[in-house]
Regions:
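HIT superfamily nucleotide-processing domains
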Residues: 1-128
Length: 131
């Protein structure tokens, strides 16, 4: 399996594996918004670019600005709905080569407050099994 190939990509294939991990909330301007089913971080979302792009630097200025506008739009909604103290942004693509941002709300007294968010063991094992 070559995760940099769109035919092996979780987001491009939009298959059962993806829908077991996340709920698609809405299409955005140039991306798709997902809510993780695993909610250690209440409100944790993911914004995935609409096309199979490996890195933010592969986008034109216009595409990058539109993608980041989608990310900001989501975080503003998260602030209104969940009222977290902070939102962690994660852009990891060494295991899944499709441009996406993890958005993890952080709450004082909640998991990993004051540090970076981490997937819990259930979430990590679930992703390993499915990808």
């Amino acid at each position: 399996m070559n995760l940099s190939d769109p035919k092996d990509c979780l987001y491009c294939q939009n298959n059962q594996t993806l829908h077991e991990l996340m709920i698609e909330i809405a299409p955005l301007s140039v991306s798709r918004l997902f809510l993780f089913k695993e909610q250690t971080y209440r409100g944790r979302c993911l914004v995935a670019y609409k096309d199979h792009v490996h890195d933010l630097n592969m986008l034109s200025d216009e595409e990058r600005n539109a993608f980041m506008a989608d990310v900001v739009r989501v975080t503003r909604a998260m602030q209104k709905v969940f009222n977290p103290q902070k939102i962690n942004y994660g852009a990891y693509s060494d295991k899944l080569s499709h441009l996406h941002f993890h958005l993890a709300p952080k709450y004082e007294g909640g998991p990993d407050f004051g540090g970076t968010f981490t997937m819990n063991q259930i979430g990590r094992a679930s992703c390993r099994e499915r990808v």
